[in-house]
Amino acid sequence: MANYFNTLNLRQQLAQLGKCRFMGRDEFADGASYLQGKKVVIVGCGAQGLNQGLNMRDSGLDISYALRKEAIAEKRASWRKATENGFKVGTYEELIPQADLVVNLTPDKQHSDVVRSVQPLMKDGAALGYSHGFNIVEVGEQIRKDITVVMVAPKCPGTEVREEYKRGFGVPTLIAVHPENDPQGEGMAIAKAWAAATGGHRAGVLESSFVAEVKSDLMGEQTILCGMLQAGSLLCFDKLVAEGTDPAYAEKLIQFGWETITEALKQGGITLMMDRLSNPAKLRAYALSEQLKEIMAPLFQKHMDDIISGEFSSGMMADWANDDKKLLTWREETGKTAFETAPQYEGKIGEQEYFDKGVLMIAMVKAGVELAFETMVDSGIIEESAYYESLHELPLIANTIARKRLYEMNVVISDTAEYGNYLFSYACVPLLKPFMAELQPGDLGSAIPEGAVDNAQLRDVNDAIRSHAIEQVGKKLRGYMTDMKRIAVAG
């Protein structure tokens, strides 16, 4: 099969990369009604599979789970989760033929096998759903022409999808219809109903394309979301310990520092994160971030180029065929790093201490977020998509590190994200070592002393931070979420 994106001409590629429209709340006035009375069969009962299914059932839809015969016979975790939550469970042969919508929520590397197994069983005119378009765009899976192919992609882990729904809200979501598979013109109606059933319409929905979702998702997770956090954790820990910091304290400062720093990012973007610093520290963080952007720009661009060309996907799929040899080797090596094996610190670190002693970490976050955003936009991806795949998801990934360090992050993210993370971090760590050697006292592990600052310089830095395109679009999108949450809670 050919990479679908590479079969398109340049005009088609640009059109699909640039497809992004923030949908109005009024477009979801019918809620999930288009799918009510129809049979929805979910394949896979992992975090997305289970939690989307719970939300959809609570929204009045008929949900069941199709699992492989072995999973049922051996009562594996997927079978236990589905049955313990009161769902009907059956084999592909038992459930797929009656399904109006089959939702494939298995891991990326299983998609081809799953789709080839379920396609012959699907009735004429049924629909096939994804929450990530890798199988369609990168693998180039060919779907029967009578089948409608749609995507609903929540921009959060599955657990968050459920928790926000239970709070009466939802998570921002991308929806799309595959242009090669919409024979009855009902793809958008199906996608909107599915998104509404998960609660996504309450937080904001972007009408996108399979291509834009895949290319931006891969770029975000490889660079700022996972790769930068992993590289930053390893570099910062080693630097602190080399300069005499207690390894346990250094580990805690980094493990929980990312989460604390990005919580400010979540509430008010890069502007608020930088405002948590003293004026001298803000000026230093800004200067460090500009240096980092200059050093790392070629690496970010290489990752984007390899994603656009399909080079990344072909390399990863070759590793799939080789029993994940590279992935498993990198995973094992990460588990043996000094950061992962450091002792736990029993003392308390105050919230402001993470900011005051983490100026370099803040600079890394700023540089990584802006670079990922800029590189995506320069490649034809619309700003709203680039925002969701960079700044918006970063606090969620930082939270996984706060739970069990890099191990937890790499367990929670997909194998696709994990593979890309290692590619980036293995290149980024040696790239930044000369930069790390030139750091000054106060950049990491100790606070920058208060002192006089140049008013004009501070004014210009504040203007530069606030005027960046990601701050402009971020303020708009966070405003939409706040407004929609207010409406949802009131209604």
UniProtKB/Swiss-Prot annotation:
Q: Which reaction does it catalyse?
A: (2R)-2,3-dihydroxy-3-methylbutanoate + NADP(+) = (2S)-2-acetolactate + NADPH + H(+); (2R,3R)-2,3-dihydroxy-3-methylpentanoate + NADP(+) = (S)-2-ethyl-2-hydroxy-3-oxobutanoate + NADPH + H(+)
Q: What is its EC number?
A: 1.1.1.86
Annotated KARI C-terminal knotted domain ranges read 209-344, 345-484
- What is the top EC class of this enzyme, as a single word? oxidoreductase
Q: How does activity depend on pH?
A: Optimum pH is 7.5.
The record describes how the cofactor is bound as: Binds 2 magnesium ions per subunit.
Q: Which UniProt keywords apply?
A: Amino-acid biosynthesis, Branched-chain amino acid biosynthesis, Magnesium, Metal-binding, NADP, Oxidoreductase, Repeat
Q: Which GO terms describe its molecular function?
A: ketol-acid reductoisomerase activity; magnesium ion binding
Tell me the route in metabolism or biology where this protein functions: Amino-acid biosynthesis; L-isoleucine biosynthesis; L-isoleucine from 2-oxobutanoate: step 2/4; Amino-acid biosynthesis; L-valine biosynthesis; L-valine from pyruvate: step 2/4
Q: GO terms for CC?
A: cytosol
Q: Which residues bind NADP(+)?
A: 45-48, 68, 76, 78, 108-110, 158
Q: Name one GO biological process term.
A: isoleucine biosynthetic process
User: Is-annotated flag, keyword Hydrolase?
Assistant: no
Cofactor dependency:
Mg(2+)
Residue positions binding Mg(2+) 1 = 217, 221
What residues does Mg(2+) 2 bind to? 217, 389, 393
* Induction / repression: In the presence of acetohydroxybutyrate and acetolactate.
Pfam families from the xrefs?
Answer: KARI_C, KARI_N
Give the KARI N-terminal Rossmann domain ranges.
Answer: 15-208
Summarize where substrate binds, as residue positions. 414
Show the active-site residues. Answer: 132
Q: Which PANTHER family match?
A: KETOL-ACID REDUCTOISOMERASE, MITOCHONDRIAL (PTHR21371:SF1)
Job of this protein = Involved in the biosynthesis of branched-chain amino acids (BCAA). Catalyzes an alkyl-migration followed by a ketol-acid reduction of (S)-2-acetolactate (S2AL) to yield (R)-2,3-dihydroxy-isovalerate. In the isomerase reaction, S2AL is rearranged via a Mg-dependent methyl migration to produce 3-hydroxy-3-methyl-2-ketobutyrate (HMKB). In the reductase reaction, this 2-ketoacid undergoes a metal-dependent reduction by NADPH to yield (R)-2,3-dihydroxy-isovalerate.
Q: Name the family.
A: Belongs to the ketol-acid reductoisomerase family.
The entry's protein name is Ketol-acid reductoisomerase (NADP(+))
